[in-house]
Amino acid sequence: MELKMPALAIWSPEDEVLGAIAPLALGVAAGTALIVDLDVAGPKYAGDLTLASLVADGPTKSDLSPQRRGIAVVRNGGVDPEDAEQVLRALVDGWPAVVFRLPADHIGGDGAIPILPLIPGSMLNRPAGPAVYQRAGWRVRVPEGGIVLPRPRSGTIAALLAGRVPHPGDRWIRAWRRVWEQSWA
């Protein structure tokens, strides 16, 4: 798989669960990736490493590049992303793929990719431009420029929510590879 961009910023303004698991799925789809939560009030991902500690103590050599294949997660820990800019740049330089998880109230318009449930109707105020859509139980026309993910298996979601990595051959995980392969610029 060819990564068009080594770092992607995503957010899910409409679905909190999707906002928590999408960065993990995107990381698993890349093979080896770092997921960095830029949301001060983000999910309680497993692990001890936080962006706040990397800013306060400085990253170690082992923080700046993968030590094994798979995903690593950096929880936020209460730091504003603007205060972490140097650390974030160093992480992007050292990792083959980085996923930045943005808060649900992110405004957009800065190249970040919205992850949205594919639901009928027009009640929701959707961000303009391309997006990743999560198929739900309805047949809905896909907005132009969007990537549509198939419905995930319940075991896949359960694994991600429990801090386990689903099989990389999982249909839903494989579908996330298209997000890496797309040119979002």
Regions picked out by a protein language model, each given a short descriptive name:
Residues 38, 117-120, 136:
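Cofactor-binding loop segments of dinucleotide-utilizing enzymes, especially the Rossmann-like FAD-
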Residues 6-15, 34-97, 104, 155, ...:
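P-loop/Walker-type NTP enzyme "switch/lid" segment
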Residues 32-33, 98, 112, 130-131:
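Hydrophobic anchor at the start of a short beta-strand
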Residues 42-45, 108, 121-126, 138-143:
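Short, charged/polar "capping" segments at the starts of alpha-helices
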Residues 18-21, 82-86, 121-126, 140-141:
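Active-site-adjacent loop/helix micro-motif of nuclease/hydrolase catalytic cores
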Residues 1-9, 130-185:
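C-terminal lobe/tail of nucleotide-utilizing enzymes
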Residues 93, 104-129:
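Inter-motif core of Ras-like GTPase G domains
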Residues 3-28:
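Glycine-rich P-loop/Walker A and Walker A-like loops and their local beta1-loop-alpha1 context
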